[in-house]
Curated annotation (Swiss-Prot):
GO terms for molecular function: carbohydrate derivative binding; D-sedoheptulose 7-phosphate isomerase activity; zinc ion binding. GO terms for cellular component: cytoplasm. Residues 36-197 form the SIS domain. Belongs to the SIS family. GmhA subfamily. Substrate binds at residues 51-53, 64, 93-94, 119-121, 124, 174. Homotetramer. It comes from Pseudomonas putida (strain W619). Pathway: Carbohydrate biosynthesis; D-glycero-D-manno-heptose 7-phosphate biosynthesis; D-glycero-alpha-D-manno-heptose 7-phosphate and D-glycero-beta-D-manno-heptose 7-phosphate from sedoheptulose 7-phosphate: step 1/1. Catalyzes the isomerization of sedoheptulose 7-phosphate in D-glycero-D-manno-heptose 7-phosphate. This is Phosphoheptose isomerase.
Amino acid sequence: MDMQSRIRRLFQASIDTKQQAMDILAPHIEQASLVMVNALLNEGKMLACGNGGSAGDAQHFSSELLNRFERERPSLPAIALTTDSSTLTSIANDYSYNEIFSKQIRALGQPGDVLLAISTSGNSANVIQAIQAAHDREMIVVALTGRDGGGMASLLLPEDVEIRVPSTVTARIQEVHLLAIHCLCDLIDSQLFGSEE
């Protein structure tokens, strides 16, 4: 297969996964946006975590809220728990890598805050511990997962929201996660500041 054909195949696989996910995920993304907006209206904040590409997604989400998404508006409170290398390495060194997010949540999380927990497999041990810590702090969890939801899915409470991408391919799951994050940012802005359409 020549390279351009391979590129077209990858584009088509991404398109197919997004089309399959659209109707399945729309109600879950809507519900997640309502949870987040309710928290923001009640002086809550967003915390976000994940590993690798999912860490990048957590940072992307928090930066879109803190700075701006597609229009000028006031900054919104969001913290990516993936960015402080001194904190991450001290917790990993002194305790366990599995606690790098949960210890931060126990310090920063408040009742009514929202945790955006991201894992393509749903089985990242440190994200699972983050969900447990969020529940201990009476936070609501929005979980971005894939495959069968993994261990994260079994931890979620009725008030939590899972956005589970219907795919087993990590790259496709990540692509839909990013689109879901952009949908959340758009919905948050439109609910808080009105639609620009």
